């Protein structure tokens, strides 16, 4: 009987450790699904955000001039470079997910509501309009 109680306690402790997740577990550098950008996710005050730290096509044809955020709907932001643009903002952690955030897509200049879910070394990032039902999920990989 003592062995059963001990084994049950060990199993419960192990399962709790496996299924519990730190809110900061999402922090780090991620490679997007297309493998053409790396995004660093960090904590800003009590929320999580992410900025572009590398892109495959960072420069214009001349190889020197950094590409700009030319498709941004806000004309005042079109002159900023793609590098270091904050594309994830406002995420809060709730029960294994990062929710209530926004994701900006510099390829089309649009911002969407977003949520994220961590699964091992992959991050499911869902952008949507209105309800999460009406959206698209991409899977990012953690960069070691």
Where are each of the predicted segments found?
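Bacterial Sec-dependent N-terminal signal peptides
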Residues: 1-22
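Cleaved targeting-peptide boundary
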Residues: 21-30
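Short beta-strand segments that buttress and anchor functional surface loops
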Residues: 30-32, 100-106, 125-128
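Short, solvent-exposed loop/hinge segments that bridge or flank secondary-structure elements
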Residues: 32-49, 53-71, 75-93, 117
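Short, surface-exposed coil-to-beta transition loops
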Residues: 35-38, 109-113, 134-137
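C-terminal/domain-terminus segments
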Residues: 42, 102-122
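Short, solvent-exposed aromatic-acidic interface loops
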Residues: 55-57, 104-108, 129-132
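Edge beta-strand at a domain terminus
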Residues: 120-122, 130-144
């Amino acid at each position: 009987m003592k062995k059963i109680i001990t084994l049950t306690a060990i199993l419960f402790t192990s399962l709790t450790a496996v299924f519990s997740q730190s809110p900061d577990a999402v922090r780090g550098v991620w490679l997007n699904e297309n493998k053409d950008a790396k995004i660093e996710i960090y904590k800003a005050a009590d929320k999580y955000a992410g900025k572009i730290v590398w892109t495959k096509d960072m420069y214009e044809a001349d190889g020197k001039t950094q590409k700009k955020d030319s498709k941004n709907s806000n004309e005042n932001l079109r002159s900023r470079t793609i590098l270091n643009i904050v594309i994830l903002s406002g995420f809060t952690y709730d029960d294994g997910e990062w929710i209530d955030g926004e994701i900006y897509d510099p390829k089309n200049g649009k911002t969407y509501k977003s949520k994220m879910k961590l699964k091992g070394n992959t991050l499911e990032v869902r952008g949507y309009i209105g309800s999460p039902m009406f959206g698209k999920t991409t899977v990012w990989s953690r960069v070691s």
